[in-house]
From Swiss-Prot:
Family: Belongs to the peptidase S1 family. Snake venom subfamily.
Assembly information from the UniProt record: Monomer.
SMART domains to which the protein is assigned, alphabetical: Tryp_SPc
Cysteine-cysteine disulfides: C50-C66, C142-C210, C174-C189, C200-C225
Tissue expression summary: Expressed by the venom gland.
Pfam families found in the cross-reference section: Trypsin (PF00089)
Enzyme class: hydrolase
Primary site of residence: secreted
CDD domains in the record: Tryp_SPc
UniProt xrefs under InterPro entries: Peptidase_S1_PA, Peptidase_S1_PA_chymotrypsin, Peptidase_S1A, Trypsin_dom, TRYPSIN_HIS, TRYPSIN_SER
Keyword vocabulary terms for this entry: Disulfide bond, Glycoprotein, Hemostasis impairing toxin, Hydrolase, Protease, Secreted, Serine protease, Signal, Toxin
Name this polypeptide is given: Serine protease sp-Eoc49
Length: 258
């Protein structure tokens, strides 16, 4: 069984930070509060929680399966119980998907582009990250981060985002771990073969960052996170760069790659 890495109906998030709960990366440590400036938190009052990435002053990138009603988007957030002075809250003005029905598969088109209701201002804790110029190289060291579970299968949830490093692996490694994968897909296989480090529940939609560019979007993985020889699957952003840039430029009829 595979696990879509979004947390739903597990917690009711309140507008008061002191009452909010959170989720994070297994095997990582607390992120430096000054080094996740593009990281966004997506949530609603019914308990759906995801990550996202600021790629433009008006645009956030996330996973299609993170679409939710009454979405709120926070940027510049670190400790859920102790808000930063420069953090900003936004709502979606538009959402764009590769498929009109908002469908996706476990290996294709799990991507959502969100236009914010108003631009964000750059600050010490908020700044967009670059889209990829090329796909990441095999064995590249990349960064994962988010408010996702830090233990699995018995999940625990701290108040701060966790960060960790993982490697880009051969796609065949994920095919061996998850037999349902096709021979080719628009996803990246990334993780640590020995296990112990992984994205998990609540990290969906968050970034896989390689060399200062967003190369992947947290999509799905094993039901128990951080198992040996069971890496995570990430939407391959470089395959969608033209679509993303066209939408941002105002071409809302742009189509995704087949």
């Amino acid at each position: 069984m595979v696990l879509i890495r979004v947390l739903a109906n597990l917690l009711v998030l309140q507008l008061s930070y002191a009452q909010m709960s959170s989720e994070l990366v297994v095997g990582g440590g607390e992120c430096n509060r000054n080094r996740h400036r593009s990281l966004a938190l997506l949530y609603n009052s019914s308990g759906t929680l995801c990550g996202g990435t600021l790629i433009h002053e008006e645009w956030v990138l996330s996973a299609a399966h993170c679409d939710m009603e009454n979405m709120k988007i926070y940027l510049g957030l670190h400790n859920l119980s102790l808000p930063n002075k420069d953090q900003q809250k936004r709502e979606p003005r538009e959402t764009h998907f590769c498929l009109p029905s908002r469908n996706y598969t476990l290996w294709d088109k799990d991507i959502m582009l969100i236009k914010l209701n108003r631009p964000v201002n750059n600050s010490p804790h908020i700044a967009p990250i670059s889209l990829p110029s090329n796909p990441p190289r095999l064995r590249s060291v990349c960064h994962i981060m988010g408010w996702g579970a830090i233990t699995s299968p018995n999940e625990t949830y701290p108040d701060v985002p966790h960060c960790a490093n993982i490697n880009i692996l051969r796609y065949s490694v994920c095919r061996a771990a998850f037999g349902r994968l096709p021979a080719q897909s628009r996803t990246l296989c990334a993780g640590i073969l020995r296990g112990g480090i992984d994205t998990c529940l609540g990290d969906s939609g968050g970034p896989l960052i390689c060399n200062g560019q967003i190369q992947g979007i947290v999509s799905w993985g094993a039901e128990v996170c951080a198992k040996p020889h069971a890496p995570g699957l990430y939407t391959k952003v470089s395959d969608y760069t033209d679509w993303i840039q066209s939408i941002i430029a105002g071409n809302t009829t742009a189509t995704c790659p087949p």
